Amino acid sequence: MFSKDQTLAKTDTELWSAIQQENTRQQDHIELIASENYTSPAVMEAQGSQLTNKYAEGYPGKRYYGGCEYVDIVEQLAIDRVKKLFGAEAANVQPNSGSQANQGVFFAVLKPGDTIMGMSLAEGGHLTHGMALNMSGKWFNVVSYGLNDKEEIDYEQMERLAREHKPKMIIAGASAYALRIDFERFAKIAKEIGAYFMVDMAHYAGLIAAGEYPNPVPYADFVTSTTHKSLRGPRGGFILMKAEHEKIINSAIFPGIQGGPLMHVIAGKAVAFKEALAPEFKVYQQQVLKNADALAKALIARGLRIVSNRTESHVMLVDLRAKKITGKDAEALLGSAHITTNKNGIPNDPEKPFVSSGIRLGSPAMTTRGFKEAEATKVGNLIADVLDNPNDAATIERVKAEVKKLTDAFPVYG
């Protein structure tokens, strides 16, 4: 029998220490990685519940194990809430990640050797949309569209390639694209050539849920997403689909590519979907956009170039070449000042991916802390201070002290 006194602090001091240090890092550093956010205590409570003990292969009302009457309630709540949140006909909340959600759709309707078309990774796409080293690039014939001279999606190129290659599936969505995507235009060309249309909205899901970014659900056959990032839930994935595709998607996830679902994570998803349905979530997402705009403008004012010259979402790519610094070095320097970012390639980047000429920044996490435009502008100036003085230890220490003032004033968990 387990005793409730057998806490982690008592039973595994090494692991406990590492977790405490990470908690301190999250509190004391400004998080600007666009794919990261902070979940609510309620989400973490659900994930740390006894639901982690339950195996539940199958779907609500049709399980391969007994004792699933209560986890059925949990999963059905998640399904119903996410359908309401995005206006979807059907949903699967079992994917363990966004990548597995994408893989599930591929497994459902494609065969090895089929042609797919997605956004080039080098110009802002995601590795699961056809990167050569990814399963999607190994299993399928890949055609990639990219950006035009204005660093906007080249819709004319996309349409031309679609008509020429007639892919079985067209994919929209990105991991490093700051502008709005015209999902309706993608849907029209997909219909014209008889292709499936899938949208990976992982980065934009929170904004879409709040009505602050175009909703792909009315246009796409399949919409995949993560549940973290801008949606502010646990780490996981889900798939939205037309009702006609529900059976094949469910079969593709289980037993196709996964076994028993992670019921404690699905519970966390259900909590996050309920939170996203609240009016406060719309206010939060509106502030996410305001903060991203303020951050971008502050950086531009300090001589940095934003790819596409603006952001229309939570994310932006910063071209560092004018500062004569690589993304790898900028990430390390900013990290030493307690500002967390990630190096990222920019369009036509001359550097290798692990070096890169840019950094990717996002506003969701700092907005969760309570930052508004004034703080976002200050963060932009602190970033520029570091990049303007990369070899000055005094500047790093000064910026670190300014960061501490901000993080103390805006704790992650009050």
Curated annotation (Swiss-Prot):
Catalytic activity: (6R)-5,10-methylene-5,6,7,8-tetrahydrofolate + glycine + H2O = (6S)-5,6,7,8-tetrahydrofolate + L-serine
Subunit composition and interactions: Homodimer.
EC number(s) stated in the UniProt entry for this protein: 2.1.2.1
Annotated compartments: Cytoplasm
Molecular-function GO terms, alphabetical: glycine hydroxymethyltransferase activity; pyridoxal phosphate binding
Native organism: Herminiimonas arsenicoxydans
Keyword Ribosomal protein attached: no
Site (Plays an important role in substrate specificity): H228
Family: Belongs to the SHMT family.
Sequence positions that bind (6S)-5,6,7,8-tetrahydrofolate: L121, G125, H126, L127
Transmembrane segment boundaries: none
The protein, known as: Serine hydroxymethyltransferase
GO CC aspect terms: cytosol
Annotated keywords: Amino-acid biosynthesis, Cytoplasm, One-carbon metabolism, Pyridoxal phosphate, Transferase
Cofactor (UniProt): pyridoxal 5'-phosphate
Record PTM N6-(pyridoxal phosphate)lysine, positions in chain: K229
SUPFAM superfamilies (alphabetical): PLP-dependent transferases
Entry annotated with the keyword Nucleotide-binding: no
Role description: Catalyzes the reversible interconversion of serine and glycine with tetrahydrofolate (THF) serving as the one-carbon carrier. This reaction serves as the major source of one-carbon groups required for the biosynthesis of purines, thymidylate, methionine, and other important biomolecules. Also exhibits THF-independent aldolase activity toward beta-hydroxyamino acids, producing glycine and aldehydes, via a retro-aldol mechanism.
UniProt pathway: One-carbon metabolism; tetrahydrofolate interconversion; Amino-acid biosynthesis; glycine biosynthesis; glycine from L-serine: step 1/1
GO biological process: glycine biosynthetic process from serine; tetrahydrofolate interconversion
